[in-house]
Each structure stands twice: as structure tokens, then as C-alpha cells.
Amino acid sequence: MIIKNEWLIVGFITSCHGINGQLKVKSLSDFEERFLKPGMRWLQKESEHPSKIELISGFKQPGKEIFIVKFKGINTRNHAEQLKKCKLLVKSDKLPKLKKEEFHLLELIDLEVKTLENDELKIIGKVINLENEKNNLLIIELFKNQKKVLIPFVKEIVPLVDIKNNFLIINPPNGLLEL
């Protein structure tokens, strides 16, 4: 899940790797350098404030969205075990600049969701969050019944995103909103 505030979750520590304090991180980011390039990062344990930690090195496991990382001061498996399930964060004001017509997934939260019915746009709900495991999914709350539905964020289903005017249009396959 991505939370719209000053932090953006870019990965989760899933497990330890080896005995020298290395960790496996599941990436939620399109920017691999967040896990490869040494420098300061932010970690957050459950129900705690984020804290700084220095990334020393990292590499990507072939064919996976998993990175093996090494943080300064984490030198044993026991130290690494304490960081399992931590979130790897970046400050939302440090997001990379994008080209025109591009946007960060974080910007989709709170957009109105519209469908085209009989040549008319109808507001049916709003994006309340995102889920990003293997594919990006929009979590949409429908206004008619406050039901939450997951919508795949693909061009065929979400043909238009208008950040400037605060809405997106979905073209869901029959039955998707009734699930």
C-alpha cells in the first residue's frame, strides 16, 4: 500500500540473506538506483517513525523484483532479523522529475473515478489507495455502496488519467465492479 503524505514506500524488507547482515528487499519502485546506489535511506518499523540508515551496497536478483542490500552497522544475521518487515521509504518531495504527461502513482490517490455511460461521464467513486505487488492495482471506493474494488492500472481499463483536473476514467470489463 502507498500512503499519500510526506513518505512514499519504495520497498519492504522480506528476509535475511546469508550470515553477514544482508537483507532481501521487495521493490515497489521503478527506480532501481534506490536499492543499488550507496547513500542515506529511510527505514520504518511498524508503528514507529522513519529513521535514517546508510545503504552501503545492493544488487538485483536476476529475474525478480528482489534486491539484496547491505546497510551500515548491520553486520550479523541477528541484526538483520530485527529489520525484517521494515518499510524502505523516500520523502515524497524527493521524487524524480518526470516528463510532461507522466505522473507518480502516488498522485492517483484521491482522484475521482469516472466511467463513460451513454456518452456521458459519470462519477462512480474515488481512488483511496494503491496496491503494488507484481502489478499496480487501484483501490477504488464506490460511492453507491462504499464497497472497495481493485482495478488493474492498465491502459485498456484506465484509458485516461487527468491529474490537473483530478479525475481518471475507467473502462472496466463487465462484472469487474460487482466482484
Swiss-Prot record:
Tell me one GO biological process term: rRNA processing
Q: Which residues form a coiled coil?
A: none
Protein's UniProt name: Ribosome maturation factor RimM
Coarsely, its chief localization is: cytoplasm
Annotated function? An accessory protein needed during the final step in the assembly of 30S ribosomal subunit, possibly for assembly of the head region. Essential for efficient processing of 16S rRNA. May be needed both before and after RbfA during the maturation of 16S rRNA. It has affinity for free ribosomal 30S subunits but not for 70S ribosomes.
Among HAMAP family, the record links this protein to: Ribosome_mat_RimM
Q: Does the keyword rRNA processing apply?
A: yes
Q: Which InterPro entries match?
A: PRC_barrel-like_sf, PRC_RimM, RimM, RimM_N, RimM_N_sf, Transl_B-barrel_sf
**Alphabetized UniProt keyword annotations:** Chaperone, Cytoplasm, Ribosome biogenesis, rRNA processing
* Cell compartment(s), UniProt: Cytoplasm
Quote one Gene Ontology molecular function term. ribosome binding
Which family, according to UniProt? Answer: Belongs to the RimM family.
Question: Where in the numbering of this chain does the PRC barrel domain appear?
Answer: 100-176
Q: How does it assemble?
A: Binds ribosomal protein uS19.
- Is-annotated flag, keyword Thylakoid? no
Free-text comment about domains: The PRC barrel domain binds ribosomal protein uS19.
Instruction: Report the gene name.
Output: rimM
